[in-house]
Amino acid sequence: MHFAAQTHVDNLFKNNFEFTKNNIYGTYVLLEACKVTGQIRKFIHVSTDEVYGETDEDAIVGNHEASQLLPTNLYSTTKAGAEMLIMAYCRSYGLPVITARGNNVYGPNQFLEKLILKFILLAMRGKTLPIHGDGSNVRSYLYCKDVVDTFEVILHKDEVGHVYNV
């Protein structure tokens, strides 16, 4: 399972090259290693639902796995780029790949810069909570145990080339 990535979007504005290097080139390095060894039974890439771009809040149905990718920031663009590389390796070299598109995970031992823990700590200190944009954005969150259970199911699927929304 390929979880490795730069994910904290605020850091993107400080050093966007690291996002490209880690999320695209890092994925390329892993894919090449898998191709060269020929020993990989399954390559599960962990992506993000942000590759879909902005979702209409009035939509009855959310994004489907076959929905067009319309990333809106460099983070989601690098994850979409990595997905394109992965599918190319699947088609060109027969690498057995699966992509899982998740969203924000929360739970114990979360990084301090992640939103839920960051807001809790700031609120406990009576500090201002930073809001990006006009504050109308909505995000989904998954509890870490639920994510683990989901990846356990995906790990045992034999549907190579498929994308799953988590």
Name each model feature, range by range.
Residues 80, 105-118, 125-127, 132, ...:
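Glycine/proline-rich active-site loop of Rossmann-fold NAD(P)-dependent oxidoreductases
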Residues 17, 120-121, 139:
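Short alpha-helical segment that forms part of, or immediately flanks, the ligand-binding pocket
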Residues 1-105, 145:
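N-terminal Rossmann-like NAD(P)+-binding domain of SDR-like oxidoreductases, especially those catalyzing
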Residues 56-57, 120, 124:
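A generic structural signal for secondary-structure junctions
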Residues 67-75, 108-112, 140, 166:
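Alpha-helix initiation/capping motif
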Residues 34, 90, 123, 154-155:
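Hydrophobic pocket-lining residues that define ligand/cofactor binding sites across diverse proteins
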